[in-house]
Amino acid sequence: MVLHGSSSPKPCPNTKNCRMLLLIDNYDSFTYNLVHYLGDLGAEVEIRRNDQIDVQAAMAMNPAGIILSPGPCDPDQAGICLALTAAAAETSTPLLGVCLGHQTLGQAFGGKVVRAGEIVHGKMGMMHHKGQGVFAGLPSPFAATRYHSLIVDRATLPDCLEITAELEDGTIMGLQHRDLPLHGVQFHPESIRSDHGHQMLQNFLNNVKVPA
């Protein structure tokens, strides 16, 4: 694992074989859980806070994939995240959004982010999924930890986004773009209480060809 802070970004020295992940830190304590899980899987991770880099500089780093961390705000307050999601879509750069990052994916394509029916803080939920994308090879349902007060509104979900996981009541817990390598999970795979967190991240790394 190689960790880098918010110093001036360095382009990948070998564009053809670049395997670096760019993780956007939305000022959340779970960010480094994600970093450590990715490090367990052998990934090189560059970390930048959401207001300490612009989209042009982020894309100039030529990341093999982008991860949008959880955070305490909504997508409109998450620095470059919405614009970076659009840039990832334009360049077909694989992206994984976690919690706030998942909501950002939904909003970036026209979905609405609304108040959840209940605020959850460390609540376990059963994830019912289709076995695709980051959920490939996982049992359904499985238990995962939730910390959120916002959700992507199912009624406003655009056709280009597919629901890949949900709670029993239909609350969206996972999204995937139908044509692009863009994924989101509302829960926290990086929580020690979530089942199969490493495997979900490995599935994303397989997508961006970052070796374990």
Predicted regions and their residues:
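Cysteine-nucleophile active-site neighborhood
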Residues: 19, 63-137, 141-143, 201-203
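Short hydrophobic/Thr-rich beta-strand motif most characteristic of the beta2 strand and flanking loop
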Residues: 44-50
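Acyltransferase
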Residues: 191-212
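N-terminal beta1-alpha1 ligand-phosphate binding loop
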Residues: 21-38
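Catalytic beta-strand/loop cores that center a nucleophilic Ser/Cys/Thr
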Residues: 131-179
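Short amphipathic alpha-helix with an adjacent loop that forms part of the alpha/beta core around
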Residues: 54-62
